[in-house]
């Protein structure tokens, strides 16, 4: 749901809808969350901060497939095979800034790159979850990749992105 200029009226949403077709300042006419069924899925939380040896990743850090593989191994899930509909959650530690330091939280964030996005889409995951606000690394080190993860997962593949999750509660459990 992101266009070339960010979240503006010229953007294209899933199935090619534009903002005029989607809704107005008063809400959505199409593709609103009220149309989603409850999500019941097998899920896996990938603690990327832990495999990087940090409490919190840095602004612009890109999560790679090497990170995913290392997290699966560290969590005793080396044999993990994604099944259609799986929920793939990422912990970067960024959620520690939510409400406590909104300027820092919104200044950018770590996130997945296109390599991981292709893995998610190729495995037909149904949902992704992030402790960041976009899921993408911001700023992205690739100048041609402004919210390209959003565009790829949501617009092209219809994968639901859950953002601003408190994944710290899960890794601490």
Predicted features by range, described:
Residues 1-173:
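Active-/binding-site microenvironments in catalytic and ligand-binding cores
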């Amino acid at each position: 749901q992101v266009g070339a200029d960010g979240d503006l009226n010229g953007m294209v949403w899933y199935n090619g809808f534009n903002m005029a077709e989607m809704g107005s300042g008063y809400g959505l006419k199409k593709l609103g969350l009220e149309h989603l069924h409850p999500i019941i899925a097998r899920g896996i939380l990938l603690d990327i901060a832990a495999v990087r040896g940090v409490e919190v990743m840095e602004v612009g850090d890109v999560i790679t497939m090497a990170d995913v593989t290392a997290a699966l191994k560290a969590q005793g899930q080396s044999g993990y095979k994604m099944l259609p509909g799986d929920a793939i959650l990422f912990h970067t530690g960024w959620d520690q800034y939510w409400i406590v330091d909104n300027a820092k939280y919104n200044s950018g964030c770590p996130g997945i790159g296109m390599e991981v996005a292709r893995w998610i889409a190729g495995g037909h995951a149904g949902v992704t979850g992030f402790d960041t606000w976009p899921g993408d690394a911001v700023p992205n080190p690739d100048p041609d990749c402004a919210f390209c993860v959003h565009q790829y997962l949501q617009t092209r593949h219809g994968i639901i992105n859950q953002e601003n999750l408190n994944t710290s509660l899960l890794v601490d459990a």
